[in-house]
A protein has these predicted regions:
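Long, contiguous interaction/recruitment modules in multidomain scaffold/adaptor proteins
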Residues: 61-162, 334-345, 403-432
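TPR alpha-solenoid repeat register
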Residues: 200, 234, 268, 302, ...
Length: 675
């Protein structure tokens, strides 16, 4: 009820619909099951229809069709069914067992009105149920299983995950989870066993391309092609990495073979179209786009290329029609809106792009036009974008491509601007920053610390951590901008001395910033300086008019440190004073409250204060609303129940037996009683 009590509407509990094409919402452990994570194919667009089946009052669901949801069950003498129709239905309901008719009746059903009936039947043969001649169920009459549809639900226990294929599967699945460091680790293990494992080479080439290592990606793709010249992924990566590396002839060769594979055909034709545009071959580009659209008619990339080609080749009516069609499908298609705006003489997008980081949309579109060789459009978009150093760097670089003018004199001016809300994330931006640094150095100008910072956070984003650290260490103590030191501390988290110095510097620069206090206290805790952590937290909490969220974030952190040093009662009192708004999956506050109560109760039991201990064990089982966690239907109270029994009968053997079945953290809470 905790969520319902906080809702501003009045129509009861809400439902969160989750859409998807897969059998389940895969988690990390799904790697070791048959239900792997799935990645998107490049430039792929997929559409599907979903049917939702409310089963209110049916008791369950056995089968579903586009007409209705059906629930079957057995009694000793009857077959009973519930039908929940998703539309008004009229027709003959026929039930057969082993081709012998059991039931035949005309029925009229209303949408979502539960229909229940039964027929005498004690057999266990094959059941067939139809409504108005259309199938509702066809399967076993006792288990209600539909024959020959069982899908394997567990992986074979004797599958060798350390085999070449097992290592490859792990690496590929981690890549699909976007856990790229782990993906590289497991693919590397596979390639150590077999340096010419073609699928692993392709996946590794893809990871290297993402990191901006185009030459290395191309080398791995070529290594795979030395084994199989027609491998689809390796050819596509040969095209993609060579295109980024500037080897357009090699790129065309890779794409030309990749089009043999349906999975990469549309993307490869799109790449060929981009190269044709850069070479000024408008007819060739249009031909490639048409082939891409023939395979993927809904591909945004191909549709954008087509409408741009129409506009650039003076076919305004076709361009307008293509842009309007794209906007009808997706009103947030800013590429189409820009194309339509250019045609109408009003290419202004500022009133349509209203997200938190609008400049990123402009950069994304500008890079798309640059890749197609349309530098004038790229520059026009960048000039519309909100002020931001990355926007200005791209604009300067694009202007240089158009006019070949001198740009070094503006780079330092751009780079000395505030780095607020600057988050370079694209591998293309890594090469822009590297070019910029080289140009400044060549012209004898100093390189502002902001450039090293941008390059460092981008390298970190691309999992090139050692290079990122080099960029940060090159900066030293020059910045007076506190977030720089918070980021540095996070990057160097495992190097405690560097992280601690960075956090101290951040707090010195912004003593009133709660984040500096919170992160420095966390660091103190990691090096067993709990008292120092409590001291700086209390200094902040003693300030007046703190926002509620600051009070509960630092208050909960204080309670954790109090538990760490054994001040359980004080921790409980702090938790009682907090007000934590619930958020999905957040259970840390309640877990801490429960832990504090259990640890204090154990301490009281150890000291013979049974009555007081029982009070805190009862409190550990409560779910105070101020802690933001709603009580589950079946809370796990095994530990508190066992401790209550121990408080009464002092049977240490029974307590040990229960505790051994619990997680290690739970066992640690009662160590002083059973060691």
């Amino acid at each position: 009820m905790i969520w319902e009590n906080l809702l501003t509407d009045t129509d009861g509990q809400y439902v969160e619909l989750q859409s998807g094409r897969l059998f389940n919402q895969a988690s990390g452990g799904s790697t070791l099951s048959p239900f792997k994570h799935i990645s998107f194919a490049p430039y792929a667009v997929d559409t599907w229809t979903e049917n939702w089946y409310p089963v209110r009052k049916t008791g369950g669901i056995t089968a579903a069709t586009e007409m209705a949801a059906l629930y079957l069950r057995r009694t000793p003498t009857h077959l009973v069914w519930n039908i929940s129709p998703v539309a008004d239905l009229n027709g003959e309901l026929v039930i057969k067992a082993d081709n012998k008719e059991l039931f035949n009746q005309n029925i009229a059903l209303k949408t979502l009105v539960n229909y229940i009936d039964s027929v005498r039947y004690a057999g266990n043969g094959h059941l067939n149920i139809t409504l108005d001649g259309r199938p509702l169920f066809d399967g076993h009459g006792e288990s209600f299983a539909i024959e020959n549809t069982a899908r394997p639900l567990v992986s074979p226990p004797d599958f060798d995950w350390e085999s070449e294929y097992g290592l490859y599967l792990k690496g590929k699945d981690f890549a699909s989870q976007r856990q790229f460091v782990l993906a590289e680790e497991w693919l590397g293990k596979c390639l150590t066993k077999n340096p010419y494992h073609v699928p692993a080479l392709g996946e590794m080439a893809q990871l290297l391309h993402r990191k901006g290592l185009y030459k290395e990606s191309l080398d791995l793709a070529n290594k795979a092609l030395s084994v199989n010249t027609y491998d689809p992924l390796a050819n596509y990566l040969r095209g993609l990495s060579a295109q980024q590396y500037g080897l357009l002839t090699v790129a065309k060769d890779g794409y030309a073979v990749a089009v043999l594979s349906p999975a990469y055909r549309a993307a490869a034709f799109t790449g060929l179209a981009q190269i044709a545009l850069r070479e000024g071959d408008w007819g060739g580009a249009e031909g490639f786009v048409e082939k891409a659209l023939a395979h993927q008619p809904a591909s945004d990339h191909s549709r954008h290329l087509q409408m741009m080609i129409f506009r650039k080749t003076q076919r305004s009516d076709q361009a307008r029609l293509a842009a309007e069609s794209a906007l009808a499908d997706n009103p947030l298609d800013h590429f189409a809106r820009y194309e339509l705006g250019v045609l109408n003489g009003k290419p202004e997008l500022t009133k349509y792009i209203t997200n938190e980081l609008p400049h990123e949309d402009y950069i994304e579109m500008a890079l798309w036009y640059r890749e197609a060789g349309q530098y004038d459009d790229a520059l026009a978009l960048l000039k519309q974008a909100p002020e931001n150093p990355m926007v200005e760097l791209w604009a300067s670089d694009t202007q240089h491509l158009i006019s070949q003018g001198n740009k070094e004199n503006v780079l330092s001016q751009i780079l000395t601007k505030s780095p607020e809300f600057v988050f370079p994330s694209r591998h293309e931006e890594l090469h822009l920053l590297t070019r910029t640094e080289n140009e400044l150095t060549k012209s004898g100008q100093p390189v502002p610390w902001q450039l090293h910072y941008y390059r460092g956070i981008l390298l970190w984003q691309l999992d090139r951590v050692s290079e990122a650290k080099e960029s940060f260490m090159a900066i030293g103590e020059a910045p007076k901008w506190p977030p720089f030191y918070l980021v540095k501390a996070d990057l160097f988290e495992e190097q405690k001395e560097i992280a601690g110095q960075a956090l101290e510097r951040a707090r010195a620069l912004s003593p009133d910033d709660w984040r500096s206090v919170h992160l420095l206290a966390t660091h103190y805790g990691s090096v067993n300086k709990n008292e120092e952590a409590l001291s700086i937290i209390d200094q902040k909490l003693n300030q007046k008019n703190l926002p509620v969220y600051v009070q509960y974030i630092l208050g909960q952190q204080k309670a954790r440190f109090l538990v760490n040093i054994g001040k359980y009662r004080e921790s409980i009192q702090v938790m009682k004073q907090l007000t934590i708004l619930p958020n999905e999956g957040a259970a840390a506050a309640h877990n801490l409250f429960r832990e504090g109560n259990i640890r204090y109760a154990v301490e009281l039991l150890k000291n013979g204060k049974t009555k007081d201990a029982l009070t805190y064990l009862d409190q550990a089982e409560t779910w105070p609303e101020n802690l933001g966690s709603g009580q589950p239907y079946k809370p796990d109270n095994r530990l508190t129940t066992a401790l209550k029994a121990y408080a009464v009968d002092k049977k240490e053997t029974d307590l040990k037996k229960t505790v051994q079945e619990l997680p290690e953290k739970e066992q640690n809470m009662v160590k002083i009683l059973i060691d």
